[in-house]
Amino acid sequence: MYSSENDYSILEDKTATGKKRDWRGKKRRANLMAEHYEALEKRIGAPYYGKKAERLSECAEHLSFKRDPETGRLKLYQAHFCKVRLCPMCAWRRSLKIAYHNKLIIEEANRQYGCGWIFLTLTVRNVKGERLKPQISEMMEGFRKLFQYKKVKTSVLGFFRALEITKNHEEDTYHPHFHVLLPVKRNYFGKNYIKQAEWTSLWKRAMKLDYTPIVDIRRVKGRVKIDAEQIESDVREAMMEQKAVLEISKYPVKDTDVVRGSKVTDDNLNTVFYLDDALSARRLIGYGGILKEIHKELNLGDAEGGDLVKIEEEDDEVANGAFEVMAYWHPGIKNYILK
């Protein structure tokens, strides 16, 4: 649970498989992001950025856990998360929650419909920072149109859509794209099959593009039981349902892609400025068809704007026989210490 250094103890929180949860790394990255928002306030003069910097600095300052007396495992039960879109700490917690929700939804879809699964990636050309926000809006509208086309509606049972943005730092451009997990009828792979060229043509039409976009489509092979514990691991195995869940539930933007290095730089500030503008107050994930229905049936919360303390939905009995473990962020040591 902890390791001692001098007269204080350092927080150690591990998954059931023994992998260490990187609370320290996420908090340090959140504080670095706060420094960038502070610098943006000085550069632009807008209090908006200063307020976000303050929220980031206060994110996860204190963590309260319950420790299971039998296993020794910690379970977070109290914390304050800032929910700033670009916060590395909150992005990590959010991705765990989305992955866990998707695990439950996919298992239920398999049970109810016995469906097949395909993994679709929809892209457009890279854009400059000032074009990122309108480009994402156009993509959202294009996605809506795509799923209104008869060919798609008759072949696909629903969707889970996630937006991801990567940055080409050398060219100073941004690459927004959609990862989409699609449940399909079992006969989809026969007469209803939509080939890659057709998906490409439909996406081009929906987006009204004057070029041919890159579209990737692949079948999700295998129907394995998804292990919730693996959600916290960076699994890069064969393309199976579990891999698809992990792939599609990851962060919309990797924090290391936003802030490079450990110092405030002009390049980093520009990246934070454009990504903050493009992503604030925007839904980055979406469910449709049977997956939306199942999400509602299972009474799952809002993974984007909801509680980031409780990842798993079911109530467990750990709290009954557990005792409290409090961890506090120490700015000098730059780590969580136990009191």
Swiss-Prot record:
Positions of DNA binding: 251
Keyword Transit peptide applies: no
GO molecular function, one term: DNA binding
Entry's Gene Ontology BP terms: DNA replication
UniProt superkingdom: Bacteria
Pfam (any one): Rep_1
InterPro entries, A to Z: Rep
Keywords (A to Z) from UniProt: DNA replication, Plasmid
Family, similarity comment: Belongs to the Gram-positive plasmids replication protein type 1 family.
Protein name: Protein rep
Gene label: rep
